[in-house]
UniProtKB/Swiss-Prot annotation:
An annotated GO cellular component: plasma membrane
EC class name: transferase
Enzyme Commission (EC) number: 2.5.1.141
Lineage, broadest ranks: Bacteria, Pseudomonadati, Pseudomonadota, Gammaproteobacteria, Pseudomonadales
Record-given protein name: Protoheme IX farnesyltransferase 1
One annotated GO biological process: heme O biosynthetic process
Protein's organism: Pseudomonas paraeruginosa (strain DSM 24068 / PA7)
UniProt key word Nucleotidyltransferase: no
Length: 304
């Protein structure tokens, strides 16, 4: 016991950095930056104002880190069971729950202060809503309550491009909501493919993920159905004249490949299809948003 107390009293800076899930935060900030860039009127404005670029992403990143730290606290028992997470700071006892919560509160307050001071109130309150949606609604309740947890809770994870857009414009509009809808539709096939691959771990931790509660066949069908929805939603930026032909062609090609993987997973026609579908889903989302950016700034490139 003395050793545990000593370890709690001497966490390192790396432990606190790990609490923020830095890789996840970086991905969120990339989508936030994309939202900012898409909200900037190319080619007239060209780029994001430096104040919003730096402080907007700093505030969003701090709040995202706070939500991640709360997730570590709530999931510490689950993390200690699962192979992928059993070495996390709270699971191993390197940081105490009270210390992690205090750290999360500090990050959240700092993030909100930065957003209120350097962006606009709407960005700050939407960021707070996203933080609470992930930390309280998803992690604290939905994750253990329903196999549809990732569908409902996916809205919080889909928020960063909206936050980046609103940091520039100061108001809501159809375009950033469509970006949220794309990530919202992408989340179930992305995450359920991973859940199939790690089904036994989730069952051991008593988390009601869809493959655990309804079986792999049912989950694979829903991955296919959600991928069809995603394919349709991904074409909407072209339909509402948010993007042009370059994006449309990329969305069609990327979506067709995603459907190919979802079908292969459903039919069990390729080895390791679940984890390969999961990995492709990450590539898909990255390239889709890059296509939006290229299409957005293409007129600027043509004028140079």
């Amino acid at each position: 016991m003395a050793t545990v107390i000593d370890r709690h009293s001497q966490p390192t800076w790396r432990d606190f950095l790990e609490l923020t899930k830095p890789k996840v935060v970086v991905l969120m900030l990339i989508t936030s930056l994309i939202g900012m860039l898409l909200a900037t009127k190319a080619p007239l404005d060209g780029f994001v104002p430096w104040q919003v670029l730096i402080f907007g992403n700093l505030g969003i990143g701090l709040c995202a880190g706070a939500a991640a730290a709360v997730n570590h606290v709530v999931d510490r028992r689950i993390d200690s069971i699962m192979a992928r997470t059993h070495k996390r700071p709270l699971a191993e006892g390197r940081v105490s729950p009270s210390m992690a919560l205090g750290f999360a509160l500090l990050l959240a307050l700092a993030g909100m202060a930065v957003l209120l001071a350097f962006t606009n109130p709407l960005t700050a309150w939407l960021t707070l809503a996203s933080l609470l949606g992930y930390a309280a609604l998803y992690t604290g309740f939905l994750k253990r309550a329903t196999p549809q947890n990732i569908v409902i809770g996916g809205l919080a994870g889909a928020a960063p491009p909206l936050l980046g857009w609103v940091a520039i414009t100061g108001h809501l509009s159809a375009e950033p909501l469509l970006l949220v809808l794309i990530i919202f539709a992408w989340t179930p096939p992305h995450f359920w493919a991973l859940c199939i691959h790690r089904k036994d771990e989730y069952a051991k931790a008593d988390i009601p993920m869809l493959p655990v509660t309804h079986g792999e066949r049912y989950t694979k069908l829903h991955i296919l159905l959600y991928t069809l929805v995603l394919f349709a939603v991904s074409l909407m930026p072209f339909v509402i004249h948010m993007s042009g032909l370059v994006y449309l062609l990329c969305a069609l090609a990327l979506g067709a490949r995603f459907l190919d993987w979802a079908w292969a997973l459903y039919c069990d026609s390729r080895p390791h299809a679940a984890i390969r579908t999961f990995k492709y889903s990450i590539v898909y989302l990255f390239l889709l948003f890059m296509a939006l950016l290229v299409d957005h700034y293409l007129p600027l490139k043509l004028l140079l």
